[in-house]
């Protein structure tokens, strides 16, 4: 694939993730949009690493690091959401003001 096609795809994924993160009122949907943003960033890292210097794997290694961070976020995020649901009986972002109690 050409560089422009991959960058346009990554920009679309990033834009969809940002739009979903801004407009979503559901915490689970916000976590999914955050994962979409991280995957778009990973696609950029791998693409630029392959396009500019294919012998050095700095972009690929950094992409694996971001995948590890996303895996930790995917493990901890739903646990936090379930704890908030248990205490507040809602997973909507507007209804869960954690500073009041």
Curated annotation (Swiss-Prot):
InterPro entries listed in its UniProt record: NADH_UbQ_OxRdtase_chain4L/K (IPR001133), NUOK/Mnh_C1-like (IPR039428)
One Pfam family matching this protein: Oxidored_q2
Reaction catalysed by this enzyme: a plastoquinone + NADH + (n+1) H(+)(in) = a plastoquinol + NAD(+) + n H(+)(out); a plastoquinone + NADPH + (n+1) H(+)(in) = a plastoquinol + NADP(+) + n H(+)(out)
Principal location listed in the UniProt entry: plastid
UniProt subcellular location: Plastid, Chloroplast thylakoid membrane
EC number(s) per entry: 7.1.1.-
GO cellular component: chloroplast thylakoid membrane
GO MF, one annotated term: quinone binding
Protein name: NAD(P)H-quinone oxidoreductase subunit 4L, chloroplastic
Naturally occurring in which organism (per UniProt): Manihot esculenta (Cassava)
């Amino acid at each position: 694939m050409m560089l422009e096609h991959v960058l346009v795809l990554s920009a679309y994924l990033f834009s969809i993730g940002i739009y979903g993160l801004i407009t979503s009122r559901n915490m689970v949907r916000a976590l999914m949009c955050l994962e979409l943003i991280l995957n778009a960033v990973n696609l950029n890292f791998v693409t630029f690493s392959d396009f500019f210097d294919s012998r050095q794997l700095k972009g690929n290694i950094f992409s694996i690091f971001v995948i590890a961070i996303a895996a930790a976020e995917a493990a901890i995020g739903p646990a936090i959401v379930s704890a908030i649901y248990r205490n507040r009986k809602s997973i909507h972002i507007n209804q869960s003001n954690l500073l009041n109690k």
